[in-house]
Amino acid sequence: MPATVDIRRAADRGVTTTSWLNSRHSFSFGDYYDPANTHHGLLLVNNDDEVAPAAGFDTHPHRDMEIVTWVLGGALAHRDSAGNHGVIYPGLAQRMSAGTGILHSEKNDSTTEPVHFVQMWVAPDTSGIDPGYQQHQIDDALLDGRLQIIASGMPGHDAAITIHNRYAALHVARLRTNNAVELPAAPYLHLFVAGGTLALEDAQGALSTGDAVRFAPSEGRRVTAVEPSEILVWEMHAALGSSRG
């Protein structure tokens, strides 16, 4: 099967807008449903959310899902039924394992400034695990401009936080102008431009904030920052339905 490189532009994402929320969906989510756009590899959700001051998501349930949150600006307060609570901000990675079931809320911790974050969902490779929570500060690790593994379940990975899927890993990089990184080689890879502008090797047109690229497979291509940029990269060695067992 030939390799595919599917560039998805920011303007083509699904949108949910309320009085307090502006959410842009890379995949089907909520009222936005496209049967041809439900996931890529193991990644089910890649939501780019902005929440108004003092607002947020009231307590709601999740089950059998690994949920990773990465804040781009502001501060997000988390509280769940397992007794975990905390405030996450740029440079601090968070993972919540829903497992057999968990309730949680997410609120903007500021009364004056919005909070902007990306939330990503990956199915675990084993259902019915205990709910769990982990967060870790990785700001310093991002200073060198290289891809850093911040969340992984893959054997041999030294990640800041763990996820319960041995076929998936999330990498993050903050790139200075003209810095380049080589993307991991994997059967499935999802690149999301959290901020900035980049050039993708052997592709026409720049990648801008909110754009995404879906590789199947990826083959170690390079991306170069045209301006200071931040990228989120999911490396996946299975597709939905093939990693459970």
Question: Where are the language model's segments positioned?
Answer:
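Jelly-roll (double-stranded beta-helix
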Residues: M1-G245
